[in-house]
C-alpha cells in the first residue's frame, strides 16, 4: 500500500474506521493494532467481535472478506501481513481482546469453537459470555463442539438478558440448557441447533414463555425421539423452522418412535419449515395466517413395515396426521417431500380443501407413489403453478388425474435417468391440461434433443421454455 492510500485511510474519522473494522474478523481487526497507537485505540471500540478458533489456528484458511468487495483490498493485504506477527493461544487471544475493550458497548459477539487443536477450557467460556452480556450485547452467536463440556449447563444469565435481540446456540456434545428462569423481553430471533433441554418439552415451553416478542424461531437437528410431546405456543411468531434428526435404520433415515403429542399455537405464523416423524396426536394446530410451508414428515420404520404387510388393503391407515394436514389449509405456497406424500396416503384420513393454495411443489422419489396427488389437485381450486422436482415415482395403475385442475404454469425438473418414462409422463400432462399456458423444463444437457419434440403436443396457447439446470452448468 502506498503512502497516499495510507493517508486516505488515516484521515477518516474514528467512527467510520470502527465501522470498517467491524467487517473484519476479530483476528484481522486485532492485527491493525500493530499499525499505530491510534489503531490500537480503535480496536477497543469495535462493536462486533467474531472469534473462530479454526480461522485463528490455521493461518492459511481462506475466509470471505467483505472489505475486498468494498474496495479496501490494499488495506486488507496490509492487515494480513501484520497479523502474521500475532502469536498466542486462542483463549489468550479472546481474553486480551475482551480486556482491551473493557465495558465499551457491544452489538454482536460471535464465538465458534469446533477445531479441537487448541482445546478451550469450558471454565474460560462462561466468563466470556458473562462479560459480553454485561456490556449489553444484542446479537449473541455461540457455536460450540466441546467433548469436555458435558456437565454444567450454559450460564443462566443468557436467558435473563434485557438487551438480546438475536440469540444463536449451536452445541454438539455440550451442556444442557437450564431455563428455570427466562426473561428475554427484546428477543426477536432464536436459533437453536442440537441442544438439549432440562425437562425436555417442559423446559422448552419455559424458554418460549420468556420471549414475549419472538418473531423467528429455528430449531435444527432436534432429537424428537427423546421428547414425548412438543408444543410451540408463541402469539408473535412469524417464522418457524423445526428440523429433527433422522436416524438411520434398515436403509431408511427415520426416527424410531412417534411423539405422543405435537401442538402449534402460532396464529400469526406466515412461514413454516417442518421436518419430523409424525406424532400420534396433534391436539392444536393454529396456522390461520400461514403463507408458505415446506413440509417433510415421515413414518417410523415400524409403520413402513406395517404398510408393506397390509399393502393389499384398501385405505390402509397406520397413523393419523390428519389434524396437522388440515391445519395447513390456508397456505398459499406449499412444498411436499416424498415422505410427506406417503403420510398423505397412509396416515391421513382426509385431504382438506386448500382454498388459497396457488403454488405447489412436489418432490418425487422412485420408491414413493403419487396416489394422493389427484385428490390434492382436486382440492386446490386456485392452484396456478405446479412444480415437479423429478417425475420418477412408484408405478400405479392410474395416471394422475390433472385435467380438471386450474394449473396454468407447470415446471418440471428432469434428470437423465429413465428419460423415456419421464417424457411419457410429460406427454400425458400436455394432453390432459387444457388450461396450461406455460411449461418450463429444467433439464440436463443430454436430454435437450428429446424435449424439442414436445412442443408439437402442447396447445397453441401454451409456451414451452427450456432452462439448463444447475447440474449441467
Curated annotation (Swiss-Prot):
Listed CDD domains: F-box_AtFBL13-like
PROSITE patterns to which the protein is assigned, alphabetical: FBOX
Signal sequence interval, chain numbering: none
Alphabetically ordered keywords of this record: Leucine-rich repeat, Repeat
LRR repeats: 168-194, 196-221, 229-254, 333-364, 365-390
Domain F-box intervals: 6-54
Entry keyword Repeat: yes
Record SUPFAM superfamilies: F-box domain, L domain-like
InterPro entries named among the record's database cross-references: F-box-like_dom_sf, F-box_AtFBL13-like, F-box_dom, FBD, FBL60-like, LRR_dom_sf, LRR_FXL15/At3g58940/PEG3-like
Gene3D superfamilies for this protein: 1.20.1280.50, Ribonuclease Inhibitor (3.80.10.10)
Pfam families (alphabetical): F-box, LRR_At5g56370
PANTHER family listed in its UniProt record: RNI-LIKE SUPERFAMILY PROTEIN
Protein name (record): Putative F-box/LRR-repeat protein At3g59170
